[in-house]
């Protein structure tokens, strides 16, 4: 005991010495006096533990407490006119009261979504509802000290969506159907329009957005500059021509039907967007990304992703919120930024990227962990820069992949990124499925199904004619048209923005929303049926094989891609 007393006494003496520079004389005398008298039994005030607490109280005052903060406060935000005071309703999950009420009434039936609800757990989750019925989930609770916070709701939602996506993929794979359908249907089942296992979608959709980023990054790794030059004219000029034709057709139709011209132009721009994620996922499953029709389709899809920013700049003009001149200036600025971004990316491709990858290979001689992390970081940095410049995350991630594809480490990088891509791609496709309201589709299945058939026929015909104009054979043209026949997931964002700007009316909004959702569900089945139909003997003379084109230049294009694939 004497040895432990000496050790404790020495520790406290050293602590007192370190505090002497900031402590007054009276505190030191009281501190050391208590240490000397600490051996007196029964003296609670003079115990070492009590003294240690008083020293800590003196050292760390209330003003020194580092409170957890998000960098803003209520008073300062209102004073700086960064926020406005508004009445909200706070929804708390009081477990005791709720259980007592249920036991007394005995009327609340069991609901399956309660199994996945966090309301029965000792959770501090809080929900706020404003006067416009907007729902907000608290993400950063004020705390006296900085603590590690865990969002149990997000963890639960991710577990649900990943498990159901896996089940859906397994079931449809066993049935010989595309797993994309399984992902989409799994999302629709667990989403707000289904069994409501997931009701707060913002956080899940944000995490799932990485699926598109990594999907296009991996696509860029396979989509080399040589292939880009082969399909460049049809991708850029053909993609632009397809958008213009749809906008013109819908605009004329709107005028003939007595609707507003701006509404018709928006519908045409809306319908021109195709789903990059769904199409690319299908091409990857069929190992068709290197085929000629796959390259043409991917080129047009990438061009559409570039045009998304221009369409957002066009919406205020169509809504009458800004003049035509202002809209033209906004589009011109975006084109200038895009040119600068691509120029800088080209310079980095030949100067920085090869040296960077060689360094990562040297540092990753023992394990690929550092190389994998560096590749993901490079992809995310490029996507983030593109988004900050007013372009899109998708364009930035694709450009990052193309930059790395010019090096000898492209295949190695693809192997490292593929597992991450597959996980987040399934997560993203399932999150798209959560936007699909099964009850809404079923209640209006007749008009929505007719709309989907009309959209598929029109988009397939226009895309096939455009590709055929660039002297591709009928099989390739029709195949590309079918692949581009659906409406893309970015149409949901475009549609929401147009509704806020009053470009379209409520009924048209619901029609386009349901048509988009149903087209995404039926597209994978269409992908599976149409190619099989084209291989029927009676149709072979209308749809010859890709390599049987009578045009010599097309044969050179196909052979160039094949040679490049063998040497890559």
From Swiss-Prot:
Expressed in roots, stems, leaves, flowers and silique. The keyword Transmembrane helix applies. Disruption phenotype: No visible phenotype. The triple mutant kea4 kea5 kea6 is compromised in cell wall biosynthesis and has a reduced growth, small rosettes and short seedlings, and is sensitive to low potassium K(+) availability and to high salinity (e.g. K(+), NaCl and LiCl); it also exhibits a reduced luminal pH in the Golgi, trans-Golgi network, prevacuolar compartment and vacuole. These phenotypes are partially suppressed by the cell wall-derived pectin homogalacturonan trigalacturonic GalA(3) in the dark but not in light conditions. Residues 1-20 form the signal peptide. Keywords: Antiport, Golgi apparatus, Ion transport, Membrane, Potassium, Potassium transport, Signal, Transmembrane, Transmembrane helix, Transport. One of its GO terms (molecular function) is potassium:proton antiporter activity. Electroneutral K(+)/H(+) efflux antiporter involved in K(+) homeostasis and osmotic adjustment. Together with KEA4 and KEA6, promotes growth and development, and facilitates endosomal pH and ions homeostasis, as well as salt tolerance (e.g. K(+), NaCl and LiCl), probably by supporting cell wall biosynthesis during rapid etiolated seedling growth. This is K(+) efflux antiporter 5. The gene is KEA5.
């Amino acid at each position: 005991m004497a040895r432990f007393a000496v050790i404790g006494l020495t520790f406290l003496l050293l602590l007192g010495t370190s505090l002497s520079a900031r402590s007054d004389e009276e505190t030191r005398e009281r501190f050391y006096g208590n240490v000397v008298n600490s051996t007196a039994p029964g003296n609670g005030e003079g115990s070492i533990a009590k003294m240690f607490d008083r020293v800590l109280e003196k050292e760390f005052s209330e003003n020194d407490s580092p409170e957890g903060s998000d960098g803003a406060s209520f008073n300062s935000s209102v004073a700086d006119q960064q926020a406005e005071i508004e009445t909200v309703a706070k929804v708390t999950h009081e477990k005791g009261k709720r259980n007592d009420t249920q036991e007394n009434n005995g009327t609340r039936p069991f609901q399956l979504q309660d199994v996945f609800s966090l309301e029965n757990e000792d959770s501090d989750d809080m929900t706020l509802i404003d006067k416009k019925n907007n729902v907000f989930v608290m993400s950063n609770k004020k705390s006296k000290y900085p603590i590690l916070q865990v969002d149990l709701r997000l963890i639960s939602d991710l577990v649900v969506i990943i498990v159901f996506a896996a089940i859906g993929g397994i079931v449809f794979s066993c049935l010989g159907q595309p797993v994309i359908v399984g992902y989409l249907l799994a999302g629709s089942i667990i989403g707000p329009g289904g069994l409501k296992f997931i009701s707060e979608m913002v956080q899940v959709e944000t995490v799932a957005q990485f699926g598109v980023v990594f999907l296009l990054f991996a696509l860029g790794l396979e989509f080399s500059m040589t292939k880009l030059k082969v399909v460049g004219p049809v991708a850029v000029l053909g993609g632009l021509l397809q958008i213009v034709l749809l906008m013109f057709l819908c605009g004329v139709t709107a005028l003939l039907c007595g609707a507003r011209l701006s509404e018709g132009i928006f519908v045409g721009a809306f319908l021109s967007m195709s789903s990059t994620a769904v199409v690319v996922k299908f091409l990857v499953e069929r190992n068709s990304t290197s085929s000629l029709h796959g390259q043409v389709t991917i080129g047009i899809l990438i061009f559409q992703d570039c045009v998304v920013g221009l369409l957002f700049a066009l919406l205020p003009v169509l809504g009458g919120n800004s003049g035509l001149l202002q809209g033209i200036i906004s589009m011109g600025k975006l084109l200038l930024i895009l040119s600068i971004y691509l120029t800088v990316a080209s310079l980095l491709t030949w100067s920085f990227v090869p040296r960077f990858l060689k360094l990562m290979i040297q540092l990753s001689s023992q394990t690929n962990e550092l190389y994998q992390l560096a590749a993901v970081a490079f992809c995310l940095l490029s996507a983030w820069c593109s988004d900050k410049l007013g372009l899109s995350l998708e364009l930035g991630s694709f450009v990052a992949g193309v930059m790395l594809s010019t090096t000898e480490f492209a295949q190695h990088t693809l192997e490292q990124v593929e597992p991450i891509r597959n996980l987040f791609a399934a997560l993203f496709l399932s999150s798209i499925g959560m936007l699909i309201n099964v009850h809404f589709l079923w209640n209006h299945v007749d008009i929505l199904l007719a709309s989907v058939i009309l959209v598929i026929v029109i988009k397939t015909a226009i895309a096939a004619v455009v590709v055929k104009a660039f002297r591709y054979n009928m099989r390739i043209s029709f195949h590309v048209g079918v692949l581009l026949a659906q409406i893309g997931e970015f149409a949901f964002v475009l549609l929401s923005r147009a509704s806020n700007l009053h470009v379209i009316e409520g009924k048209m909004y619901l029609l386009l929303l349901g048509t988009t959702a149903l087209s995404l569900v039926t597209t994978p089945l269409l992908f599976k049926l149409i190619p099989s139909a084209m291989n029927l003997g009676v149709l072979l003379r209308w749809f010859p094989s890709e390599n049987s084109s009578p045009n010599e230049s097309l044969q050179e294009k196909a052979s160039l891609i094949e040679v490049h694939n063998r040497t890559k």
